[in-house]
Amino acid sequence: MHATRKTGEMPAHWPQYGLAAVIALVISAGLHLVSCGKTSGGVPQPTPAQPQPGATPPNAVLTFHNDNARSGQNLTETTLTPGNVKASSFGKLFVIATDGKVDAQPLYLPNVNTPSHGTHNILYVASEHGTVYGLDADTGSTLWKISTLLSGEKPSDDRNCSQVTPEIGVTATPVIDPAAGPHGTIYVAAMSKDGAGNYHQRLHALDVTTGAEQFGGPKEVQASFPGQGAGSSGGTVVFSPGQYEERAGLLLVDGIVYTAWTSHCDHGPYTGWVIGYDQNTLAQVSVLNVTPNGSEGAIWMAGCGPAADASGNIYLLDANGVFDSSLDARGFPGKGDFGNAFLKISTANKQLAVADYFEMFNQAAENGSDQDLGSGGALVLPDFNDSTGKARHLAVGAGKDGNIYVVDRDALGGFNPNSNNIYQQVSGALSGSVFSMPAYFNNTLYYGAVSDRIKAFAISQARLATAPSSRTSHSFPYPGATPSISANGTSSAILWAAENDDPAVLHAYDATNLATELYNSSQAPDSRDELSEGNKFIVPTVVNGKVYVGTINGVGVFGLLK
């Protein structure tokens, strides 16, 4: 991903729950299994049953795009329905001001018992000024806020790069484990600059009730890896904090917080890093470099978090970079360089290792023309039975070439110089590049590419339809849209999408027919619901009857009007 090209850029604290709440907890964790009722190939099809950090309270949003599969669906929304989401009854309730841009997706915990303010539903918001807020999600009042900056520090400057500007503090969506520490913990990656001009990347672990640092944090991000690639010395590649940014959302799997790193406008030298930290000690437990003997291969993914399956394998798309087309006996790049690839990364024994990969057959041409996969995010699909009755374990991703790539998680496809040996490729399905990721709901995949209409692709017998079943009438400018889904089980499904414009626009569509727009924030008279300017990678958070939308100076809160 180069300057304007390779970037992902364009030119005792939880109450005791009764039986009903336990059922809701199971639903919110994604454990629907065969209860959804819709079938494919004669077999009931599940919504994703993905591991969630800790014990997930009902109506919680703990991680980017709702779960580790990155499905983007909240299936416990009982307040907002296609019948009441309309300009006459739904709109902007208030705006929460922040001290910087809000690029990270807001997260949400219900019924949090705080030591000083009683019990609240709390919205967690992080700004590019390096501030993390614990806010009353229903009123917007500040319960606590902390700065991730140490004494004498300020947020990082933009590193002569217009991607995140004018300052860089917290870009990546944090992750919450409500069972970690005495009251629950939110993990935050933040960048800063000290008085001597040195740059710092740190992992913070904050108490969800007070914002206090936990586990001896923050932890300075430092790493090295064997290799002779860009920026190496003496056979070792070293992580230089000023060269990198944590844009991808954090991922929590089996007690390890994973970070994945990108560059600033492709200012070299840089390579592709994934680094894991013990969630209870912040000790670094594993490091992987995906281009250790080459260069580039950064992990942008438009702010999307790496996905994970139920076995803890991580799936991500990395950007333009060196790929070794001379393969070893396993069919892997001989020097371990996986630029511009769809990667499956094992976390067995809490150690990171590339377990499988898919590389486009024309990777050299795609790399040279900046048509890499790394601009978009990966999504782990639930299991589907194919036409023979065989269970298929699939993941999906798309990048700048407008194709949708569906991979078999048991055999991604590797590299063949003559053709793409993958499970399914839907060519030309999208009318623009993807700087976002899809959402999944009820056997349907929703994609919003650049300057394209959001499209719904049905999944039947473990195959993705080659043409959309419905699409929005409105096209979304750069960077397109990462949709979110709210539903009550399989009913009352709404697709939400934020349009990056000035002002930003929140859209709501009937998820069963995207031609039906239920609402947008430009419809009400007298600019009643108008937002401020949008950010590139806004992802609406929809939970407990409200929709939270980040902007350049705060969070817009939408809900039913009184």
Language-model segments: what does each one mean?
Residues A20-H32:
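Bacterial N-terminal signal peptides
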Residues M1-W14:
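N-terminal secretory signal peptides that target proteins for export/translocation
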Residues A29-T56:
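Bacterial Sec-dependent N-terminal signal peptides
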Residues N418-L430, P468-T472:
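Inter-blade linker and blade-boundary elements of WD-repeat/beta-propeller domains
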Residues K455-S486:
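A beta-strand-loop signature enriched in Asp, Gly, Thr, and Trp
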Residues P57-S346, L352-F384, R392-G414, F435-F457, ...:
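Mobile, glycine-rich extracellular loop/lid and propeptide segments
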Residues G413-Y423, A465, F558:
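Substrate-binding/specificity loop regions of serine endopeptidase catalytic domains
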